[in-house]
Amino acid sequence: MTAQRSTTNPVLEPLVAVHREIYPKADLSILQRAYEVADQRHASQLRQSGDPYITHPLAVANILAELGMDTTTLVAALLHDTVEDTGYTLEALTEEFGEEVGHLVDGVTKLDRVVLGSAAEGETIRKMITAMARDPRVLVIKVADRLHNMRTMRFLPPEKQARKARETLEVIAPLAHRLGMASVKWELEDLSFAILHPKKYEEIVRLVAGRAPSRDTYLAKVRAEIVNTLTASKIKATVEGRPKHYWSIYQKMIVKGRDFDDIHDLVGVRILCDEIRDCYAAVGVVHSLWQPMAGRFKDYIAQPRYGVYQSLHTTVVGPEGKPLEVQIRTRDMHRTAEYGIAAHWRYKEAKGRNGVLHPHAAAEIDDMAWMRQLLDWQREAADPGEFLESLRYDLAVQEIFVFTPKGDVITLPTGSTPVDFAYAVHTEVGHRCIGARVNGRLVALERKLENGEVVEVFTSKAPNAGPSRDWQQFVVSPRAKTKIRQWFAKERREEALETGKDAMAREVRRGGLPLQRLVNGESMAAVARELHYADVSALYTAIGEGHVSAKHVVQRLLAELGGIDQAEEELAERSTPATMPRRPRSTDDVGVSVPGAPGVLTKLAKCCTPVPGDVIMGFVTRGGGVSVHRTDCTNAASLQQQAERIIEVLWAPSPSSVFLVAIQVEALDRHRLLSDVTRALADEKVNILSASVTTSGDRVAISRFTFEMGDPKHLGHLLNAVRNVEGVYDVYRVTSAA
């Protein structure tokens, strides 16, 4: 031992120190040899950070050592990129380090290509997945590999960061979850969250930190009550607060539609006992202190989740009437909950020095339900593609399997209804669905399906049959939601098309104009192109939906025919939305001067709403006035085609000048958000002209405010004031046409 310690490479000392705590008799010479080979093979390679590439496999090995993995796994981790990224062959690696290490390295290499989408030969996939299920260390290495990559992701280009973060959320984090590796899963999710939604992440962090003092006081009170009662009941246990995970908080805000203040996970405790019987006794103690909430007790000790996770969960009405989540488990169960399948690798008991897995360890792994399911799928799948699809589904969401009357299997998300089933069969079957029979009995269309049920749907033969708007309230599958939404969007477009045609006819007749001469295919196509619509039908639809007014289109048609004098000015301002309110000005002073032409009439263009500080240009209108635009106005290119009409203009604001400003506010939706933002604006003494807010499906509120202000230099202070409103993660100026 002493000799071995003295010859260990200093770079490996941290890894060796952690590994020795669990495996004091581990053979460290093979670790040393693996590091030397990896260091030599990666010698000419650098990470994106500029660090030597060897730092990556070394970091992965350290993560696995902290998880308690065996020596063989650490060796494979050190070598896991050599076959793919260097000239080192799998045959040479296997000959030097043995079949077990070779199998692990080969599995990690193939898993990279398969699960994340690259092509691979069918039978190779089947063999690799089978081996993966029989030796889950392949999966554990892959998860650790991605964890280190996510920790160092800041050195990659933003688009690659986003792609990797999405892969991590969709595949790797769920994989860690299925392996029971909770601590790794949470870190992967939070790292991905910070990359994909940085502003939302920062706002959640800020909100959690803001509640920390009151939360800590509350938890201290709860912990003291539990500890005192457990001690009085002679139950030996440790009580601790549970860590907060930002992605989990954000998901609950979205999926359950909760405000931040209503999320139970912010207040939770964990009780760690010595014996299983003490866990059940501790539940009794907790329920004697506070009223349990109905339906919130889960016994994962008797029925382990995924065959790995064991714990008792309960939610009670705690002090001050707040929901309190409590987890109760033994210390061994907690180690498994944190490290999952990795916690089973205590090879000092399960494995001999010859590197062979003992039968008792193999049986322990085989008890894991998800691993058995992988092997079952491998046996049943007709081809590797079918098998891989099953794996992808299982990683993504909880699924149920139901049958058609002919015995075909349909996979659906948990909570699906006969309508989801109908759309899974075919889009037209979904659209025409009018009833359903489950296991031979008629059921309501909103009835939730369960595993193994036989579902039959009835369809309408009416030519105008279509979905009901009510279905949107209970379908859960993405396919059904998308198809129903597309149906009604198409229906609305058709109605808007006819409405738009009628509006155009009324507007032309109101002006006493020749309808046939003015509104024809050629002239309307020209205006559609000018207004950036795909075709004439799209233009009519936009009119019917109120995106552009019929009056504006008629004015453009007149300009095409050389009609009214102000046609070109209308062209310059065609992007002004019909809903933008007019500015009630108390003065004609727009704060702009024209060098060499004092007293000339000027006005600020509505399409880009310039304010002092913006770079501007003047455009001489047909009436002799000057329209002032930002140089980055959406209409700048068309204006500059008439260079003779572009003139210099300068800002010259006076105390009486008033400017129109529009801002967009993005925030995590909550009760009274609009009221609080409006109050912040009012406190800044601006005259609010209009406000609108829309809320997306992911609980993000997008608000638009248009207001008048005298001194735009004050805008930065105003934006900061709005940004300080709770839940707001971004606020910025937009043009009125944006």
From Swiss-Prot:
Per the record, the pathway is: Purine metabolism; ppGpp biosynthesis; ppGpp from GDP: step 1/1; Purine metabolism; ppGpp biosynthesis; ppGpp from GTP: step 1/2
* Knockout consequences: Cells lacking this gene fail to synthesize ppGpp in response to starvation.
Q: Name one GO molecular function term.
A: ATP binding
Q: Where is the signal peptide?
A: none
Query: How is this protein induced?
Result: By MazG.
List the CDD domains. ACT_RelA-SpoT, HDc, NT_Rel-Spo_like, TGS_RSH
Q: Tell me the residue numbers annotated for binding Mg(2+).
A: D265
- Is the Magnesium keyword given for this protein? yes
The record lists Mn(2+) as bound by H56, H80, D145
Q: Which catalytic reaction applies to this protein?
A: guanosine 3',5'-bis(diphosphate) + H2O = GDP + diphosphate + H(+); GTP + ATP = guanosine 3'-diphosphate 5'-triphosphate + AMP
> Which PROSITE patterns has this protein been placed in?
ACT, HD, TGS
Q: Which cofactor does it need?
A: Mg(2+); Mn(2+)
Summarizing the annotation, the consequence of altering H344Y is: Loss of ppGpp synthase activity
Per the annotation, how and in what number is the cofactor bound? Binds 1 Mg(2+) ion per subunit.
Q: In this protein, which residues make up the domain named HD?
A: 53-150
Fetch the InterPro entries from UniProt: ACT-like_dom_sf, ACT_dom, Beta-grasp_dom_sf, HD/PDEase_dom, HD_domain, NT_sf, RelA/Spo_fam, RelA/SpoT_AH_RIS
Q: Name one GO cellular component term.
A: peptidoglycan-based cell wall
Active site residues according to the UniProt entry:
E84 (nucleophile, for hydrolase activity), D85 (nucleophile, for hydrolase activity)
Q: Which residues form the ACT domain?
A: 662-736
Keyword Disulfide bond present in the record's keywords: the answer is: no
Protein EC = 2.7.6.5, 3.1.7.2
> Which GO biological process annotations does it have?
guanosine tetraphosphate biosynthetic process; stringent response
Keywords from the named record = ATP-binding, GTP-binding, Hydrolase, Kinase, Magnesium, Manganese, Metal-binding, Nucleotide-binding, Transferase
Q: Domain text from the record?
A: Based on a mutagenesis study of the catalytic fragment (residues 1-394), the (p)ppGpp phosphohydrolase domain seems to encompass approximately the first 203 residues, while the (p)ppGpp synthase domain seems to be found between residues 87 and 394.
Protein name listed in UniProt: Bifunctional (p)ppGpp synthase/hydrolase RelA
Q: Which organism is it from?
A: Mycobacterium tuberculosis (strain ATCC 25618 / H37Rv)
Phylogenetic lineage: Bacteria, Bacillati, Actinomycetota, Actinomycetes, Mycobacteriales
